[in-house]
């Protein structure tokens, strides 16, 4: 019997607001414990929430960016549960009337096939506090309590852990590019839970699902889903009964561990939040928000392929971050040579950034400077090899290519007469070149070219050197 996995993801993203969802406390990350709090986010008696309009706006913006239908009349609800990091003993969230429904994300599989992953709903809610486990006991920090979130719930359309990673990667790039969330997994502003079940391949009914928490990286997501698939297959194969449960990923031991039996919706006793008014969203406001959405990464990638003729792979890599996409876009327009711009950014510039642990926004030279480097190489002022050295100086000093070329005397030698003299000198000193060439070993010409380039310290035009070496060898 062959099994397949059925996977759905629930992704929580903290919204880019200055204040919390129901009060004026700051959302700044990293403050001293329990300093970004007030009676409202601590749930003290008599305090009343007031919805931050910016939260609703960003929720709608996320829905539009993810191809969702927007709910025109909605409400907030109470989700009742007890946990030490939930100060009110309930969370204000959305149940029956989420702000967005029925969206989708298209992912491109390794085969080149485009697969559509449905989005069931997006709702806005407040975050809980944070528990800190120590040897002395468990401490609680309420700074995060009340920080605004959206929860993006996918449909169970994902079939492999690799598809889950592609989906989450694209979701993160959209939310980040649209300035909805900074999506920093290391700070907890993007968190992902996975629901996974198995079934016999080719059948329709869903199996018994487990929810997996604590997947705080893309690698953890893929490893946890792979482990859970194997665990469930082994259990079913051995005749064991699966149960609906919540598990957490144990990074140290590379396995999932049972936390509790999975709750059902009625366990939370949802009911409308009476302290907040009904949400009314007009068509005019939706269009205003739609107009604030920038060109999204996948749209940029499509444009780079159509407008610049880039391969899909190049376009994908260049749009992994907005900064890199914008840098390339400007350089491509200024240089008129998109492929050269792509090669420099994906090649030598990325290598230098990796070596120095910097980002493209930290570069000391502008897209205009890179376009100038492409131009001087194309014009024959310097060779590609010298261009790599010039780039290293640009990276270190921030000077323009022409300034570096002038200061270091790097202009390419295009004087055919002078180069021909050097070619003959090299051939005279290395008679074996002629002998081997005449016997059919034409690759020996590369040695002669290399010797000429060595004599000129790399400044002779390699195209001219190649031509003259061939001419002079043929004469002898």
Swiss-Prot record:
This is Aspartyl/glutamyl-tRNA(Asn/Gln) amidotransferase subunit B. GO terms for biological process: glutaminyl-tRNAGln biosynthesis via transamidation; translation. Keywords: ATP-binding, Ligase, Nucleotide-binding, Protein biosynthesis. The lineage of its organism: Bacteria, Bacillati, Bacillota, Clostridia, Eubacteriales. InterPro entries: Asn/Gln-tRNA_amidoTrfase_suB/E (IPR017959), Asn/Gln-tRNA_Trfase_suB/E_cat (IPR006075), Asn/Gln_amidotransferase (IPR018027), Asn/Gln_tRNA_amidoTrase-B-like (IPR003789), GatB (IPR004413), GatB_C_1 (IPR042114), GatB_Yqey_C_2 (IPR023168), Gln-tRNA_amidoTrfase_suB_CS (IPR017958). The keyword Cytoplasm does not apply. GO terms for molecular function: asparaginyl-tRNA synthase (glutamine-hydrolyzing) activity; ATP binding; glutaminyl-tRNA synthase (glutamine-hydrolyzing) activity. Belongs to the GatB/GatE family. GatB subfamily. Heterotrimer of A, B and C subunits.
């Amino acid at each position: 019997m062959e099994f397949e996995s059925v996977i759905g993801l629930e992704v929580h993203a903290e919204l880019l607001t200055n204040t919390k969802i129901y009060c004026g406390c700051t959302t700044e990350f990293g403050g001293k414990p329990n300093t970004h709090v007030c009676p409202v986010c601590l749930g003290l008696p008599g305090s009343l929430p007031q919805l931050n309009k910016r939260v609703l706006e960003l929720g709608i913006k996320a829905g539009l960016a993810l191809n969702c239908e927007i709910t025109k009349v909605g409400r907030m609800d109470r989700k009742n549960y007890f946990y030490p990091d939930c100060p009110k003993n309930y969370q204000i969230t959305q149940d029956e009337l989420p702000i967005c429904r029925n969206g989708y994300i298209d992912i491109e599989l390794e085969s080149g096939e485009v697969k559509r992953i449905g989005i069931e709903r997006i709702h806005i809610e407040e975050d809980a506090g944070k528990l800190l486990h120590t040897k002395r006991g468990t401490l609680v920090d309420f700074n995060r309590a009340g920080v605004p979130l959206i929860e993006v719930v996918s449909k169970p359309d994902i079939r492999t852990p690799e598809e889950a990673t592609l989906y989450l990667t694209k979701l993160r790039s959209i939310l980040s590019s649209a300035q909805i969330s900074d999506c920093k997994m290391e700070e907890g502003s993007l968190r992902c839970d996975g629901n996974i079940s198995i079934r016999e391949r080719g059948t329709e009914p869903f199996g018994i699902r487990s929810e997996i928490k604590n997947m705080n990286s893309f690698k953890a997501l893929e490893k946890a889903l792979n482990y859970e698939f194997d665990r469930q297959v082994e259990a079913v194969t051995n005749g064991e009964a699966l149960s609906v449960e919540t598990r957490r990923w144990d990074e140290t031991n590379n396995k999932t561990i049972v936390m509790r039996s999975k709750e059902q919706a009625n366990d939370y006793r949802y009911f409308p939040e009476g302290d907040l008014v009904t949400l009314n969203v007009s068509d005019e406001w939706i269009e205003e928000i739609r107009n604030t959405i920038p060109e999204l990464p996948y749209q940029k990638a499509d444009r780079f392929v159509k407008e610049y003729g880039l391969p899909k792979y190049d376009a994908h890599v260049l749009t992994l971050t907005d900064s890199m996409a914008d840098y390339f876009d400007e350089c491509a327009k200024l240089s008129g040579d998109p492929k050269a711009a792509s090669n420099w950014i994906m090649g030598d510039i990325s290598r230098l950034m990796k070596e120095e642990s910097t980002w493209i926004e930290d570069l000391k030279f502008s897209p205009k400077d890179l376009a100038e480097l492409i131009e001087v190489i194309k014009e024959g002022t310097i060779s590609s090899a010298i261009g790599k050295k010039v780039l290293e100086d640009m990276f270190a000093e921030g000077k323009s290519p022409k300034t570096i070329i002038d200061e270091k005397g790097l202009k390419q030698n295009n004087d055919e007469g002078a180069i021909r003299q050097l070619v003959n000198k090299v051939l005279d000193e290395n008679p074996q070149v002629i002998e081997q060439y005449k016997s059919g070993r034409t690759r020996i010409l590369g040695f002669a070219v290399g010797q000429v380039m060595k004599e000129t310290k790399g400044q002779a035009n390699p195209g001219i050197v190649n031509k003259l070496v061939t001419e002079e060898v043929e004469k002898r």
